[in-house]
A protein has these predicted regions:
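Contiguous transmembrane helix-bundle modules in multi-pass membrane proteins
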Residues: 1-184, 189, 272-301
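Generic detection of intrinsically disordered/low-complexity segments and helix-coil linkers/edges
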Residues: 52-53, 222, 261, 268
Length: 301
């Protein structure tokens, strides 16, 4: 439909086709930037023999500034009209989303009680996409793909999960003896006991850890293991994980003994589950869009 407007030889930024075009340009630049960061070290090595690496600082300084406006447009673009959209009408359309974004952002920072600029930007962008596409799905806005709205909703969940697990993660490495206690975030962890267990093809030392919240209510029991496989002569560590919608908490049992205690690694990763849920929602949105398009093709044929 947008080709009808481009055929008149003018371009309006505040329109659905304008947002699509700008977003496509931004995403193309992001892909080119990532590709450059991937192949540049190979090119340098091929011509000079020198080995260089392109790491996180490059992508943070190049990709992030480009992806932020793309995400903002992703939230507002679907609400715009074809051809030309009045600016006041745009504000009227996005006002509920702005309010919802502010409320959810305040709620998330109230839960984690830790502020950072990166976390603030990431959470705002995530809830901006989530709230806009949630409104689209609830209001059942005409001429808008349900599959696309679901996929964009999933992108918001994915960004939320990545932000939370990157900004608020915490880890602790301690040596603990039986009945020893340590704390990470709002959880108290007690090393209850050590058991020797035997599996079908291995023997193991299993740690028993009790996890309590700030009100001294037991949250879960975690049982990491150190396993030994005699036939293959291999030692492995098996982490024990407790997951909910707010965080992953897992413990890894290292080397040790009864006299000196054991090395214990404790990891606190917030919102990780939303990375997986967001990815599944994006996949679901793609399947729904494909199904709708196949139906349209059958009708046309």
């Amino acid at each position: 439909k947008s080709k009808n407007y481009f055929s008149n030889n003018y371009f309006v930024f505040f329109s659905k086709e304008g947002s699509i075009l700008v977003n496509n340009i931004l995403m193309t630049v992001v892909c080119a930037t990532v590709l450059l960061g991937t192949i540049y070290p190979l090119i340098v090595e091929a011509f000079t023999g020198s080995k260089i690496s392109v790491g996180e600082p490059y992508y943070n300084s190049t990709v992030v500034p480009i992806i932020i406006p793309a995400i903002l447009i992703m939230g507002i673009g679907p609400l715009m009209a074809w051809g030309r959209e009045d600016k006041l009408k745009i504000l009227e359309k996005i006002f509920p989303s702005l309010i919802l974004t502010i409320i959810m952002t305040i709620a998330i920072f109230a839960v984690y009680q830790s502020f950072s600029l990166i976390g603030f930007v990431g959470v705002i962008l995530a809830f901006w996409i989530i709230s806009n596409n949630l409104i689209i799905l609830i209001k059942k806005i005409k001429n808008f793909s349900k599959g696309m709205a679901i996929a964009h909703f999933g992108v918001g969940l994915l960004i939320l999960g990545i932000t939370g697990s990157s900004v608020w993660q915490n880890e602790k490495i301690v040596r603990m003896k039986i009945a020893g206690e340590t704390k990470i975030e709002k959880y108290n962890i007690i090393f209850d006991k050590i058991d020797e267990v035997a599996g079908a093809n291995y023997v193991a030392i299993k740690g028993n850890f009790l996890v309590y919240d700030s009100k001294k209510n037991i949250v879960t029991k975690l049982n990491p293991e150190n396993r030994y496989y005699p036939i293959s002569n291999i030692f492995t560590t098996e982490a024990s994980i407790h997951t909910n919608i707010f965080r992953d908490l897992y413990i890894v049992l290292g080397e040790g003994n009864l006299n000196d205690g054991w090395i214990v690694r404790i990891y606190y990763n917030p919102l990780v589950i939303w990375i997986w849920i967001g990815s599944l929602v994006i996949f679901l949105g793609g399947i729904i869009s494909m199904k709708i398009n196949l139906k349209k093709l059958k009708i046309l044929s």
